[in-house]
Amino acid sequence: MTIRLPIAVRYAETDAMGVVHHSSYVVWLEAARVEWLEQIGLPYTQIEAQGLAFAVIELGLTYRNPARFGDRVEVETWLYEASSRTLRYQYRVWRGETLLAEGFTRHLCQDARGKAVRIPPNISGALAAHLRPSS
């Protein structure tokens, strides 16, 4: 499953050059990922209630075109890969038909002590049902 999360670029997200600061995209990816989980019926609060977290262990972004204050952008998000302990999400950030950025995050399932653990069947089943391995 793929979602598109709309975002209105705020002034605070821009830098001295008048474009969105590169770090703002990381915040947008997180917001889109959390929304993706909501939409598949697996809110992140439910994952945390089981004493688990999906820590970001790798992140990659390629910036194609700048976004500016006042732009309306959308973050396209999908789960690309799932293993027994890790997940990989893919993202594209759009302004209309213009691709602004594309990237990925990789996550490790951890318990409350920060130890790597297997993703429980109730979570892995929900995730697998919405896996989209091709872009």
PLM features per residue range, with description:
Residues M1-L5, E38, R68-R72, L79-S135:
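HotDog/MaoC-like acyl-thioester-processing domains
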Residues P6-R10, T62, L108:
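Generic structural detector for well-ordered beta-strands
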Residues I57-Y63, V75-E76, Q90:
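Short structured motifs
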Residues M1-E38:
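Catalytic strand-loop segment that frames the active site of acyl-thioester-processing enzymes
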Residues Y11, Y63-N65, E81:
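A residue-level detector for short acidic-glycine micro-motifs
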Residues Q39-T45:
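Short, surface-exposed acidic-centric catalytic microdomains
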Residues I47-F54:
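Short, basic/aromatic beta-hairpin or loop at an interaction surface
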